[in-house]
Amino acid sequence: MADKNFLTEIIDADLAEGQIREIHTRFPPEPNGYLHIGSAKAIYINWSIANQYGGKFNLRLDDTNPAREGEEYVNSIIEDLHWLGADPNGGIFYGSDYFDKCYEYAEKLILEGKAYVDDLTRDEMREYRGSDAGKPSRPSPWRDRTPEENLDLFRRMRAGEFKEGEKTLRAKIDLASPNMNLRDPAIYRIKYAEHHRQGNKWCIYPMYDFAHPIQDAIEGITHSMCSLEFENHRPLYNWVIENIFGTEFPKQREFARLNMTNTVMSKRYLRELVEMGIVDGWDDPRMPTLCGLRRRGYTASSIFTFVREAGISKSDNLIDMRQLEACIRSELDLTAQRRIAVLDPVKLVVDNYPADKTEYFDIANNPNREANDTTTRKVAFTRELWIENEDFAEVPPPKFKRLTVGGEVRLMGGYIVKCESVEKNPDGSIAVIHCTADLETGNGNPADGRKVKGTIHWVSAAHAVDAEVRLYDKLFTEANMNAIPEGSDYKDYLNPDSVVVRKGCKLEEALADAKPSDKFQFVRTGFFTPDSKNPGVYNRVVTLRDSFKPAK
């Protein structure tokens, strides 16, 4: 079923009025950082709407600020869109493709008396513009320069005759407007920095609010959909479109950005976490970046499901991270094959089982009925096994249903065993658990009909694969990182237990050839994926269960 929301209602009305025939959208990230889960919402909205209406979707790299952008980010953005399945059928473009056109249109505004070169510094300009709290604006002493003088100065700006900040091109709009964005905004500034695509061809660069509507219009974008913080920029967007192109389209429309609990979305904060070594790069599995989520084991489909379930509205809200976890958990419960992994191993010896014998039990790859997976795999069983430390208790607590001295449990898919005795290390910890097996129970229940309540998982010691397992959790302890007290340091809220590393884990041998793209449920433990950077390391995608119930 097609998604319906306030944006599609706007589009339906525009189509009904015959103003447009084909929907054309775009996603215009600045290549100065890696995309994150919030970016996925903007991608989904623009891509899905174009897809829903049989239109076109562009990717435009908004590389109008040469000081902060680079090919590393360009490549990562393109890779992320491809991974999400949101390939731009309208094409891939760069903001810098339109520098010549932006310059041409700036000269047009100058000649029409709608733009002027200002000598005020940035601080002086801020002072002269006043404030939206009632402080009136004042015209710059250079506001009434003639078009001829402004054109000469602007061309000299381009020729590199002035220092950074010495001259600025401003649009001449309305100094009395209550909207600060219309009080003669800067539309070109001097910047001496090598551009990643244009080199040193330019030393003046268009401001975002000027370049963006021009880029949209040139590409034939019909609906420029962006997050809510640009709502009060819309009158400036419209001014540029009307005064340069004389049309009503493109139309800018805004939606609420995606905010999620226990994380930060600010590129500045994310960059600090990387540069300070607090996380292991932009793709650290604790990061909200798409590459981090991908390395963690999230799928593109689970991310788009999350975005869709979070909804599209004009009201800011905070989405519980557990809703994202619920999306991937539901998906992997159906798609992930089951494997056995012992994360905190202790040796179990079946004393009445031959030391030189190996047999194989058929164990289901995915017992979830909805998965419709009837396949099995063979799991080796030998005299010496590994089980979880927590599955044995010498002095069991109340309602403990796992292994105890004198007690019985079912080894998952295998025999019922009874603990006869234990060996201990010098520090008192358990070294070896000695058991006997009821060798008649390999394919069913005991002949005498006795009930065994507990079932535990295990791995053959002779066939086990050694691995490191990383148990990831939320990066910050505070749910709403946008509401921390003013003046406090966001790093004070870092979760010291955001990752717990388990070394010496024992995995079943079927995992020896696992690839980073593979996803598994480690039975009774959680969902895991091989790390893409470190062979022999597994990342926990998400726990097996949570009390969170997503809204229907």
Regions found by a protein language model. Give the residues of each.
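N-terminal catalytic cores of NTP/NDP-binding nucleotidyl/phosphoryl-transfer enzymes
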Residues: 3-12, 16-79, 194-227
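Secondary-structure transition/capping motifs at alpha-helix termini
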Residues: 16-19, 48-56, 82-89, 217, ...
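A glycine-rich helix N-cap at a beta->alpha junction
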Residues: 73-100, 105-106, 113-116
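Conserved short loop/turn motifs at secondary-structure junctions
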Residues: 28-32, 60-68, 91-100, 123-124, ...
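Substrate/cofactor-recognition hotspot
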Residues: 306-552
